[in-house]
């Protein structure tokens, strides 16, 4: 993919590697934001309002992290790939079921996907650092903190005292 000139002094091979990591992560973060809204709109059952509002908070966080990730791609001279077509072909998440309604079913589906993205982002921290880009690693660290907290909140809704 063509890159644009920038005065950013990271080596070009580091930029290329990190741009790939960023765009792959961007696709899955956007996908996770979309499925979060899918659940938000369609869930039914006890605790509706609490979960409905919680998912709005998560969506806002995901949108903010997606924006930061996309902007980092461009800062490094790349092109942020956030179109529906790019997200659909690049996301690592499996398709979200559109035939579920019970809150618990949505929570289970979201827990699986939040866990996947949280793990992917943790790997992106290490991969960005190994490529020599601590700034991108820091961006992923911030996203990781929020994803882990969101995952904890989701899991707390379905876990029972043992």
From Swiss-Prot:
| PROSITE patterns cross-referenced by the UniProt entry | DPS_1
Recorded catalytic reaction(s): these are: 2 Fe(2+) + H2O2 + 2 H(+) = 2 Fe(3+) + 2 H2O
Keyword list (alphabetical) reads: Cytoplasm, Iron, Iron storage, Metal-binding, Oxidoreductase
**NCBIfam families referenced in this protein's UniProt entry, alphabetically:** PRK09448.1 (NF006975)
Indicate the family of this protein.
Answer: Belongs to the Dps family.
Q: Lineage, please? A: Bacteria, Pseudomonadati, Pseudomonadota, Alphaproteobacteria, Hyphomicrobiales
Any one Pfam family here would be Ferritin
InterPro entries on file: DPS_DNA-bd, DPS_DNA-bd_CS, Ferritin-like, Ferritin-like_SF, Ferritin_DPS_dom
Q: Name one GO biological process term.
A: intracellular iron ion homeostasis
CC terms in the record's Gene Ontology section: cytoplasm
GO terms assigned for molecular function: ferric iron binding; oxidoreductase activity, acting on metal ions
Residues bound to Fe cation? 40, 67, 71
Major location, coarse class?
Answer: cytoplasm
What's the domain of life for this entry?
Answer: Bacteria
Subunit relationships: Homododecamer. The 12 subunits form a hollow sphere into which the mineral iron core of up to 500 Fe(3+) can be deposited.
Q: Where in or outside the cell? A: Cytoplasm
Q: What does the function comment of this entry state?
A: Protects DNA from oxidative damage by sequestering intracellular Fe(2+) ion and storing it in the form of Fe(3+) oxyhydroxide mineral, which can be released after reduction. It efficiently inhibits hydroxyl radical production by the Fenton reaction. Does not bind DNA.
Protein known as: DNA protection during starvation protein
Q: What is its EC number?
A: 1.16.-.-
Q: What is known of its domains?
A: 12 di-nuclear ferroxidase centers are located at the interfaces between subunits related by 2-fold symmetry axes.
């Amino acid at each position: 993919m063509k890159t644009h000139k920038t005065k950013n002094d990271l080596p070009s091979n580091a930029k290329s590697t990190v741009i790939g990591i960023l765009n792959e992560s961007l696709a899955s973060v956007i996908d996770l934001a979309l499925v979060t809204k899918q659940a938000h709109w369609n869930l039914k059952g006890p605790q509706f309002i609490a979960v409905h509002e919680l998912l709005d908070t998560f969506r806002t966080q995901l949108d903010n992290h997606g924006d930061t990730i996309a902007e980092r791609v461009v800062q490094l001279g790349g092109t942020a790939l956030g179109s529906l077509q790019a997200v659909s072909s690049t996301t690592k998440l499996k398709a979200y079921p559109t035939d579920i309604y019970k809150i618990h079913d949505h929570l289970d589906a979201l827990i699986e996907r939040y866990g996947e993205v949280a793990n992917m982002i943790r790997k992106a921290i290490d991969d960005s650092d190994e490529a020599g880009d601590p700034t991108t690693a820091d961006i992923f660290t911030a996203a990781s903190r929020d994803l882990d907290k969101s995952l904890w909140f989701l899991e707390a809704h379905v876990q029972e005292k043992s």
